[in-house]
Swiss-Prot record:
ATP-binding RNA helicase involved in the biogenesis of 60S ribosomal subunits and is required for the normal formation of 25S and 5.8S rRNAs. A motif (DEAD box) lies at residues 364-367. A motif (Q motif) lies at residues 197-225. It catalyses: ATP + H2O = ADP + phosphate + H(+). The lineage of its organism: Eukaryota, Fungi, Dikarya, Ascomycota, Saccharomycotina. It comes from Candida albicans (strain SC5314 / ATCC MYA-2876) (Yeast). Residues 228-426 form the Helicase ATP-binding domain. SUPFAM superfamilies: P-loop containing nucleoside triphosphate hydrolases (SSF52540). This is ATP-dependent RNA helicase MAK5. It is found in: Nucleus, Nucleolus.
Amino acid sequence: MAKQGKNKVSKPRKPPTLKQKLKKESKVVKAKDLQWKLVDIPDNLGDYEGFYGLEEIDGVDVQIVNGKAEFIVRDNGKVENKSKKEETNENGENNMDVEDNETPEVEDEKPTEQEEEEEEEEEEEEEEEEEEEEEEFAGFEDDENNQEDANTSERVSNNDKDDKLAESNDELNAVSFANLDLPLPDDNEINLPNWQEGDLGSSISAYTLYGLSQLDFKKPTPIQKETIPIALSGKDVIGKATTGSGKTLAYGIPILEKYIQSLNLIKQNNKDKKINHPTGIIFAPTRELAHQVVDHLNKLAKYSPLSTRGIVSITGGLSIQKQQRLLRHGPGIIVATPGRMLELVQGDSELAKRLASIDIIVLDEADRLLQDGHFDEFEKILELFGKNRPKSKSIEWKWQTLVFSATFSRDLFRKLDRHQKGKSSSLMGNDEIVQLLNEKLKFKDKKPTLVDANPKEIVSGQITEALVECGPTERDLYLYYFLLMYKGSTLVFANSIDSVKRLVPLLNNLNIPAFSIHSSMIQKQRLRALEKFKEASQKNEVAVLVASDVAARGLDIPNIDHVVHYHLPRSADVYIHRSGRTARAGKEGVSVMFCSPQEASGPLRKLRRLVAGNSNKESRLNMHNDVKLLPIEMDLVSQIKPRVEISSKLADASISSTATRKEDSWVKQAAEDLGLDDLSGLEDFEDDIIKKQRKRKEGKMLSKDETKALKYELKTLLANPIKKNTRKSYITSGLQNLAHQMVTGAHHDDVLGHEKVNALSDLKGSKNKNKKIEKKRISKKK
C-alpha cells in the first residue's frame, strides 16, 4: 500500500492558460525604468498650447494595488537572449559553445520528484480556480495533444500572417503593382475617331481610350478637347464651362495619364519600385460631389493599371480612422473636402510630407472654394504642402494646378435682395479671372492658360427656363400642378431646411414619391436618400427629390428632367448651379422658377440682369429671348386645390407634433439633469417669441380623429379623377375626343380628356395645338 501511495498516478499536465502565460511573462517595474519616448509635435501646431517635453509609452498596463500604481510590462529578456544567440551564430565566434552552455544550464536542469509534484499541485489548484471563473475556456483544454498541435499551428499561422502583412504593406505602398503588367487593349476594340484625332489622340493612352469606349463616351466635349492636351503638357489650366459639360473628365484624364506615366518609369527603373506619394489631389466643396467624382473616376480607371484602392475619398461625416488606413495604403488619386483633409494633415506630419510631393492639385467648383470663409482651410493646406515639399530632382519645385468652375464672378455671389451700388456685370474678363486666382493659388506658371469653352453662356443653352407667377402661399398648389401634369424626375430646391422637411410629407400624402436631402442629415442618410430617389425614378413615372442648396453643386444625378426653384435663390451663382442639375451630357432640360409679385419687382429683375446680360450689356448671352411663362390651366388648378389644402394641413400637423415632442423631451431631460421635479412654473420664464412659436405649433396640431377624417377625405378626392372639361356629357364630345385618346394611348393618366404633355415641348413655343385641332375639324366638316 505504501508503494502504491508513493507511485500514485499523476494527472496529465495541462498546458498553461493565457492568464498563466501573461502572469509569467509580465513583471512589475518602476516608472523611471520604463522606456519613455518623446512626443513628436508637428511644426504646424505652433506651441501646442504650451505643452512641451511630452513623453509617451506603449505596451504598459497600470494596476492599482493598495492605492499605489504598479506598472506591468512583459519580460522580453528571453527574446533578447535569442537574438544574441542568432548574432553569435551568424558571426561564427569561437566562444559560442561556452555562451550556449552557460545560460541554459539552469533552465535545463531536471527538477526533483518532490518539486515536480509541488509544481503540479500548485498548477492544478490555479487551473481549478480559473476553470471556476472562466468556464467558457474549459473546452479548449480537454486534449493535450490537440492543444499542442493547436499551439504549434498558431505559431506557424502567426508567422505566416506576419509575412503576409509585410508583403501586403509593400504592395500597398507601391499602390498594388498586380496590374503593372496589364496588357494593352487591342486597337481593334477601340473605335473613337473623335478622341484619337489631333493632339488629343496622341496624348491619351490606350487604357484610357478603352475605358472611354466602354463608357460610350464617343465624342469629347469642348472643355475636354481644349484643356486635356494643355494639362497633359504640364501647364497650369483654368477651365470655365457651363454645368454638365464634362469637367470631371477634363481633369480626371490628365491625372490618370500622369499616374500611368509614373508606373511606366517604375517598370523601366527596377531599382525604385515605390510610389510614395499620390499623383493628384482633387478638392471638392461638398461631400456628395467628392463621392461622385470618385465614382466617375473609378469607372474610367477600371480598365487601367490603377487598382481598386487607387482612388479614395476623404470627406467629413465618415470614419476618420478608416480614412487614415486608406491613406497609409498609398492611393494614387485622392478626392477630398478641405475640412477633413486639413484635420488629417495637421495631426500627422509624416502624411503631410508624403502628400506634399503630389504632382497635380485640382479645384473642382473653384468659385465656391475661393469664396470668403471657404478658402481659409484650403489656404492652410497649401501652406503645409509648400513647407513640407521635398527638394529633389525627381520632384518639381511646384505642383501643377488645374482649376475648373462654371462661374467666375464676384457679382454672382452677392445677395439678390440687397441694394447694389452702381451697375454690375455678370462676367469677369479673362485677365481679371487669372489675376484673382493667381493671388490666392500661386500658380507654377507666371500666366496659367485660361480655357473658356462657353464665353457667351452662363446658363447652358440646353436648359429651357420658365416662370410661374404665384402668390407666396400658392407655391404648394402650383408645385403639385406641375408634378401632376408633367411626368418625369424632378429636383425641387428650397431655401430652408424647414421647407424641405414640410414638402416631403405634403407630396407623399398626394401619392407622389418624394425624398429629401439637406445639410442637417448625416452623410450616410444623404447617400441613402439619393439611392432611393434613383430607384424610384426608374420604377415610377414621377419621382421627386426635395433638396436644399447642398445638392446644387456638382451632383450628377442621372436623367433629371425638371428643376423647380420652390423659392427664388438668394444669389445668381446658386441659380446657375441649381439649373445645371438638368440638361447634362448633351441632353435638354427645364428650369422653372416660382415667383411672387414681391420677388418679381426686385430679386428676379437682378437675377435676370446678371444671368442674361453680358459685360457690355448690349445683348443677351444665354441664347434665350426671355424667360417663358409656364402655361397654366386654371380649371385644373381649381379642381386640385382641395387636395393640396388637406395635404398641407396633415403635413403641418405631423411636423408640429414632432417638433413639440422633441422640445418637451429636451426640457424634461434638462430638468432631470438639474434635479427638478416640478415644471409647472417653467412657462413664466419663457420668452414671448418662444411662447408665440409654441402656440403657433399647437394650433396646427390635429387630434387622432381629425387626422383620420382628413386622410379619408383626401383619399376620396384622390380616387376621383380630374376632368379636362367638366361640362362634357359624352366622352366623344368637345374638341378633345377622349375615346380616341384612350384607344391610341395619348390620354393623360391623371387628367381625363387631356393629352399627354411635355414641359419642354410646351415651353419651346410650338404652334397652338387647339388651333390645329380646330382647323382639322373644320376641314372634315367641309
